[in-house]
């Protein structure tokens, strides 16, 4: 009998030890990013360098990340605020595919709409894109939807433009080779792909007039007026008015609360390390938590509460 009790005690101890070891190692966090050359991808990799439990998943961007989050293929993802708004409301491209399991963690930085053309192009405004060959980003990316909205803002139907879907890197190469006339980028400025392109050729960024900015910010949720400062890229010698969206980190409501809390804390406590790889990384708590389309994950809300900030938590 004593032998049986001793064996049971050893078995229980072994199970507890294994459980403790498993907890200390942590669980894998599948983080949806974006395509190479974009800040989502760089940001996600900066986070994975700080936490070995993070596995970066390269995706087509915001729309893909929302669908992957809904279907359980990723635990967290980076998405544009406007795409997040449509997804949780079940509108736009998510009309028949509403996402109800997304919870906010933090807004990471502002993304600016940047329409790039050659410096000697006859294209001066978004309205001049009619009949031109234009890359509007990858399919199922947020930028493709943004492009359609911008066309609408200047009374253009997407059928009036010869659009194609390419990554930012391939778009830059195509502009350099003269096979397209313009391409859309929705990234924080500066971004690597445009910085490199501006070294290889003379470029311009199309400005948005006040009417277009008003149309975009009033009609669509999650859009803000923003400015690309002179000197951001080589050859950009004047401020360029445009619109932007917030890049928001979201988590599935099923993602462990302690994991999300620790992740949220890392965003701010390790901001200096993140900035070494992503200059735009935000450390402003007000920016991170205000005007977010969905409620916050319990774990994120717990962190904000611990530093005296109240956010809207959603079950």
Give the label of every model feature segment.
Residues 26-56, 111-177, 290, 294-299:
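Bilobed "Venus flytrap"/periplasmic-binding protein-like clamshell domains
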Residues 71-110, 120, 188-193:
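Acidic, polar ligand-binding/catalytic clefts
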Residues 39-70, 75-80, 236-237:
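Extracytoplasmic small-molecule ligand-binding "clamshell" domains
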Residues 19-22:
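C-terminal motif of bacterial Sec signal peptides marking the signal peptidase cleavage site
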């Amino acid at each position: 009998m004593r032998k049986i009790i001793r064996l049971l005690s050893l078995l229980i101890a072994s199970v507890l030890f294994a459980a403790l070891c498993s907890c200390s190692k942590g669980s894998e966090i599948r983080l949806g990013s974006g395509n190479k050359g974009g800040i989502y991808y760089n940001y996600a990799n900066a986070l994975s360098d700080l936490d070995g439990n993070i596995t970066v998943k390269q995706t087509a961007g915001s729309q893909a990340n929302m669908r992957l989050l809904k279907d359980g293929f990723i635990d967290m993802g980076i998405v544009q605020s406007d795409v997040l708004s449509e997804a949780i409301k079940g509108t736009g491209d998510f009309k028949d595919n509403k996402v109800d399991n997304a919870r906010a963690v933090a807004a990471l930085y502002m993304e600016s709409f940047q329409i790039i053309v050659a410096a000697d192009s006859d294209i001066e405004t978004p309205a001049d894109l009619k009949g031109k060959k234009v890359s509007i980003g990858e399919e199922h990316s947020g930028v493709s939807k943004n492009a359609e909205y911008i066309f609408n803002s200047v009374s253009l139907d997407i059928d009036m433009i010869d659009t194609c879907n390419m990554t930012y890197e391939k778009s830059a190469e195509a502009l350099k080779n003269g096979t397209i006339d313009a391409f859309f980028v929705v990234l924080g400025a500066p971004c690597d792909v445009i910085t490199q392109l501006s070294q290889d050729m003379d470029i311009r960024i199309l400005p948005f007039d006040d009417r277009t900015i008003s149309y975009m910010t009033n009609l669509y949720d999650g859009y803000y007026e923003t400015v690309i400062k002179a000197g951001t890229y080589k050859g950009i010698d004047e401020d360029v008015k445009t619109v932007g969206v917030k890049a928001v980190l979201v988590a599935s409501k099923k993602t462990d609360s302690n994991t999300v809390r620790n992740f949220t804390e890392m965003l701010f406590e390790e901001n200096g390390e993140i900035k070494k790889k992503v200059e735009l990384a935000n450390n402003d708590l007000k920016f991170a938590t205000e005007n977010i389309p969905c409620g916050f994950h319990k774990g994120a809300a717990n962190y904000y509460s611990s530093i005296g900030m109240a956010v809207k938590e959603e079950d």
